[in-house]
Structures are given as C-alpha cells and as structure tokens.
C-alpha cells in the first residue's frame, strides 16, 4: 500500500521514494512508488505534476492518477528505463500544487457561503488551469454573487484555521455539522473544517488558513440546465493573472472604440446602434439596386408563350441571389428567373407560372449532370456545365412544358 505523504504534509515539496512498478509505452512511463507527495486526480482537483529523478533517468510527470488503490505517476521518460526497487527523488511542481490547494479551499468557502446565504447545494466542482467551477442547484444573479463574494473574502481576511481530521467512524456531533451528507464510508473519512464556517468531507489537499487563499473572484455564471447553474471563479495568485488577462482584454477593447471612455458596455451599445443604422441603410440600398436590376433584366427577357423568361449570369453569393430572385418573381407576374454561374444555379418563378422549378432543375441535371433540389417555386443546385449551356437546356425544357 502506497504511503500518501501528501496527506501527512501537503506542503512537502520533495522526498525520497522507491519504485514499485513501471509500465512503459514508447517514450512515456507510468510509475508506481512506495510513497509519494504527488496528489492523484480526484474530487475535482487535478493530479500533481513534477519530476522523478533516478541515477540514469528522469521522468517529467505530467499527471498523477489513481487506479485500484495504486497511484500512477505518468510522464515523459528521459534516459534509461527505471527498474523495480530503484531509489528515486520526487520534486513537486509546487506552483501547480499550491494553486490547486488555494482553489480547493476557496471552493469550500464559496460553497459554504452559498449554502448559508441562499441554501444552494454544490453538486459539482472542477479545477482548471486558471479558474475553477462549481455547479449549484438553483438560480443565481449578480446581486447574489456580489453579496456572497464579500462574505467569502471577509472569511479569507479573518485568517481562519483549516483543519483536517480523519475518522474511522464519524462522530455524531461532526455529522450534524456537515454541509453535505456522507452516505457510504468504506474506510477512513477525512473531514475538512474551516473555522466555524464549514465542515465537509474531502479527499483533496488544502492550505492551512483561509488567508492563504488570498482572494476569491467570481468571473461569470450561467444556467447549465433546468435546475443547475454554473459559477466560474478564481483564487490566489491565479486570480491576479486571470484578472490581468480580463483587464487587458477590457482596456484593449475600449481602445478600439470611437469613444474610448468607459464603461465599455455603453461604447458597445453605441457601436451596435451605428451598425444597426448602417444595416438599415444597406438594406434600403439593396432594395434600390434590386429595383434597378429587376427593370434591366425584364428588358432582356425572352418570351415563351405568355411568360417572360430571364436568364442571367449572376456573381452574387447564393444567399443574396436567392433573396433577390424571390423578391423579383413576387413583384413580376408571369416571370421565370434563371440565374447561374460557376458555383450554383438558381431557378425561380412567379406563382402563376404552371411549371415546377424543382422538376425543371431535375431535368437539366439529368441531361448535363450535377445535383440540387427545391420547391415548385424555387430550386437551386450545381450543374456541371457553363451557364450558357444551362440556359439553353432550361429554355428548351420550358418551351416543351409551356407547349410553345
């Protein structure tokens, strides 16, 4: 059974150990030791990182996991393959570990305050590179978050002790104080006490006092599902780097605005109003162009019986071409519009024309090759031919259908 030194002293950064088992795959290894300061991933806390050094090898540990009671140190091997029984030195990535300890203790404080103020239970927790998240079983808003944040950071400033105790059997007086219930306990249970603020079971590593958490800052929150809200936050030195990132983004965004004075939300709304005004003007101009273009196309139309067929090589994108075609045939009775270029074909007709555009396109594709589909009034696709060939075949089919 591995000796879990990280529980005895979570501040220990290096120790000696002995290799129990080695599993190698290419340039990576999984190593089991007789004792370790590396915490394995679990309970929302990531596995530890660091270095394992032997006489003629070095393992850059990228992750630590637990499987069937064994702790595996996983990483890239440099040098010879480690041997069972070999003595090694473990060096913990302290910045990574300590940041996770700050985050984990911070989470306990935040969850305790949310429970106390709003009776919200924490149902999920995960630590990431520069932030952590919890999920709670109820709705939150900014007023609630700001109140909770103030309470949380008062607790941090008060420098309350963080005490971890292990029990074979949980005393009733402790069980009554738990923030979350313990159902199945197969072995010793670890209880984390934070002053008179929180008592909860936990298998993670924690700082010794609330002051070490530094600060807790909620970054954002949002609804995850019907009764589940996610809150993202950061703690300690990671909070400083995360807030610097956010502030650089904030001031950089503000610097791009015509009016560079805060608040950013007002500047964004000003830009949105300008964009909306320009979009309305663009739409007005588009309609004017369509009107002009429609009149020009009608003059170029070919009479097929009582109907006017317009063929045109159009370079607009499909979306704009389709919008124009629908508008054009709606305004002009007894018309058929055939648009084509190297990328697409688009056939549209006024509702009064007794020919299906879907069937017309299918006939053209059957003869020239391609693919497409649509409705009786509008069809589109791609035909393996030049626009002129497409128009010739389509006109021939239309004359046949309209019995001209």
Curated annotation (Swiss-Prot):
| Gene Ontology MF term list | alanine-tRNA ligase activity; aminoacyl-tRNA deacylase activity; ATP binding; metal ion binding; nucleic acid binding
Co-factor binding details: Binds 1 zinc ion per subunit.
Please name the InterPro entries in this protein's record.
Ala-tRNA-synth_IIc_core, Ala-tRNA-synth_IIc_N, Alanyl-tRNA_Editing_Enzymes, DHHA1_dom, Thr/Ala-tRNA-synth_IIc_edit, Transl_B-barrel_sf, tRNA_SAD
Instruction: Supply the name of the protein.
Output: Alanyl-tRNA editing protein AlaX-L
Q: What's in the keyword line of the UniProt record?
A: Cytoplasm, Metal-binding, Zinc
Q: Which family does it belong to?
A: Belongs to the class-II aminoacyl-tRNA synthetase family. Editing domain AlaX-L subfamily.
Q: Give one GO biological process term.
A: alanyl-tRNA aminoacylation
Q: Outline what the protein does.
A: Functions in trans to edit the amino acid moiety from mischarged charged tRNA(Ala).
> Single GO cellular component annotation?
cytoplasm
Primary site of residence? cytoplasm
Task: Locate the residues binding Zn(2+).
Answer: 104, 108, 202, 206
Subcellular locations according to the entry: Cytoplasm
According to the UniProt entry, where is the signal peptide? none
Which cofactor does this sequence's record say it needs?
A: Zn(2+)
Q: Specify the domain of life of the species encoding this protein.
A: Archaea
């Amino acid at each position: 059974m591995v000796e879990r030194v990280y529980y005895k002293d979570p501040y220990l950064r290096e120790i000696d150990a002995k290799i129990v088992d080695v599993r190698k795959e290419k340039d990576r290894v999984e190593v089991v030791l007789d004792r370790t300061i590396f915490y394995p991933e679990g309970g929302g806390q990531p596995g530890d990182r660091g270095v394992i050094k032997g006489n003629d090898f070095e393992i850059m540990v990228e992750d630590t996991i637990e499987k069937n009671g064994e702790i595996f140190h996983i990483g890239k091997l440099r040098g010879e393959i480690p041997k069972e029984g070999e003595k090694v030195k473990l060096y913990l990535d302290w910045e990574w570990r300590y940041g996770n300890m700050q985050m984990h203790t911070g989470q306990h404080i935040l969850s305790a305050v949310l429970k106390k103020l709003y009776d919200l239970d924490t149902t999920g927790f995960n630590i990431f590179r520069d932030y952590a998240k919890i999920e709670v079983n109820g709705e939150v808003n900014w007023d609630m978050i700001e109140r909770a944040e103030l309470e949380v950071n008062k607790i941090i400033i008060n420098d309350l002790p963080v005490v971890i105790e292990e029990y074979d059997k949980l005393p009733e007086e402790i069980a009554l104080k738990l923030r979350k219930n313990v159902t199945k306990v197969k072995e010793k249970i670890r209880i984390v006490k934070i002053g008179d603020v929180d008592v909860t079971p936990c298998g993670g590593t924690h700082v010794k006092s609330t002051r070490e958490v530094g600060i807790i800052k909620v970054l954002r929150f949002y609804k995850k599902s019907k009764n589940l809200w996610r809150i993202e936050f950061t703690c300690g030195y990671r909070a400083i780097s995360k807030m610097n990132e956010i502030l650089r983004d904030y001031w950089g965004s503000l610097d791009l605005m015509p009016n560079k004075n805060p608040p950013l939300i007002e500047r964004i709304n000003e830009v949105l109003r300008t964009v909306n005004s320009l979009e309305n003007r663009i739409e007005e101009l588009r309609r004017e162009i369509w009107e002009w273009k429609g009149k020009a196309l009608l003059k170029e139309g070919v009479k097929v019986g009582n109907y006017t067929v317009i063929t045109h090589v159009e370079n607009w994108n499909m979306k704009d071409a389709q919008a124009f075609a629908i508008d054009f045939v709606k305004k002009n009775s007894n018309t058929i519009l055939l648009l084509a270029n190297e990328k697409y074909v688009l056939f549209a007709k006024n509702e009064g024309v007794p020919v299906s555009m879907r069937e017309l396109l299918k006939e053209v594709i059957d003869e020239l090759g391609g693919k497409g589909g649509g409705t009786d009034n509008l069809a589109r696709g791609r035909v393996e031919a030049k626009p002129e060939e497409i128009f010739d075949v389509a006109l021939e089919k239309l004359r046949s259908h309209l019995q001209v």
